[in-house]
Amino acid sequence: MISAGDQIIVDLYDTYGGRTFDVYDKEMEFNFVIGNYSIIGFIDRVDVYDDCVEIIDYKTGKREVAQKDVATNLQLGIYALAAATAFPNKKIKASLHYLRSGRIKSHEFSKADLENVKSPLVTRINNILKDSNFSPTKNERVCSFCDHAKSGACATGAARLKRMFK
């Protein structure tokens, strides 16, 4: 009997082993702007085909999104916007790959779908900022991951940059 982790690898090979595609990147970093906000993150895997880019988000949990909800999944929508920014002349397909069940749920994002992601995303950001205390942290270990600190846009980041360039 093989372990659950080994079985996941066997299942992945069974799913992708015979396909021809280019794994463009794994843990692909993205950074794009919507309104006044920089959206920064990482996509688990990006495959490039002749006319299409497929974003693959691996899921390890048991809870799955219903197929009907994949098109409106905000995380996949953000990834699709990032891919559309990086590959403006290709179709964008986003997939949730559930490693435990082996199920893959996908949606090809149209231009209209991509536009429909933007407003809810900005609304969500505005609500988070309105409902939360987002004052800068004094913990430089946390700051090392923050673009505001790297740019010196906050007091902690500015002090850190001054020390770096003395």
Question: Which sequence ranges carry the predicted segments?
Answer:
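RecB-family 4Fe-4S metal-dependent nuclease core
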Residues: 1-166
